[in-house]
Amino acid sequence: MLKWDEEYLRLCKKILNEGKEVENRTINNTIKIPSYNFNLDVSKEFPILTVKKLFSRQAFLELLWIYQVGSNDVNWLQDRRVSIWDEWKIDLDGYWNAKQKVLNPDGSHEIKEIHKYFGKEYAGTIGEAYGYIVNKYKGVDRVLDIIKNHPKARDNVMSLWYNCHLDKGVLRPCVWSHEVDITNGTLNMYVHQRSCDVPLGLPFNVTQFAALMHLYARVGGYKVGTLSWSIKDAHIYVNQVEKIKELIERGKTLSIYEGYKNRTWLEGQLQNYKEEYDKILKTLTKEELINLKKGIVPDVLKSTDLKVKVCDYVLNPPSPELWVNPDVKDFYKFNNDDECKDIKVLNYKDLGKINFPVSE
């Protein structure tokens, strides 16, 4: 199991064991802990979850959308088959519509339809947030200038938090700032996250900023070092708890099999599980087979599917690394088309997809 997998599962367990259930602006309560911090050595391991599938292409395109393109236009993402921001897209009439908890005068909460007007000029966007802020204040330009010309500077900070724009964006930035440090030819990064959807947001965010470290390092000709992460309000939504428990059980199963040292025995188990898998496969309905191609494993196959993946994982462990096109040294020239062909994760293997619900 990768170091990032271990850290992630440790956080999930901590939230379930020590967290408090609280209300928030969404329909679903969260179980939260007030803060959490961790460090990852990006020089030794590219942090991408393997206990569940992470779609790196989408993650990298969202990263480029914000920090390279400086865009708030959801259509840009949709044109590249990225649907992350669909639910926060402002309609053509200038309104953003959602269901949220509203505080009544008597102190009670009520779920109501929200119709917030931003203006028709913001149609198709998320308002004045994320890439809009990057573009308006040229924050990345400053980061790159310091990396190239003033590497010893201690003020290389990129912030998305501007009070005058907070009410003009559909969402306030969750990961709201990052700092760059260069010491002895190594580029390190410190990331601040004010609110963290651990099941959905954090896996994407960590992989994105580890990639951003590599892109920044390429510009300045540096090595990558430590990614330090600070979370205020690390939470799991109550409707995500069962899936998180499933993920934790995956981790336990993987740890058990990693403890088996007899390779011949593991190879035999893998063969047995594959035969069992094929037998169950023949009993599936047409609809179940279609879903399986989409990564949705039917309940009758889940246990065997996991055992096949776990045995293969232990016998041929993943060692993910980030490939960045060596011919590109200008941050603004990394390809951001549909294929995101200048940034790829190599040697990646996962234990399968888990779908978590989103809370607006």
Residue spans for each PLM region:
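Terminal, non-catalytic protein-protein interaction segments that mediate quaternary/complex assembly
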Residues: 1-360
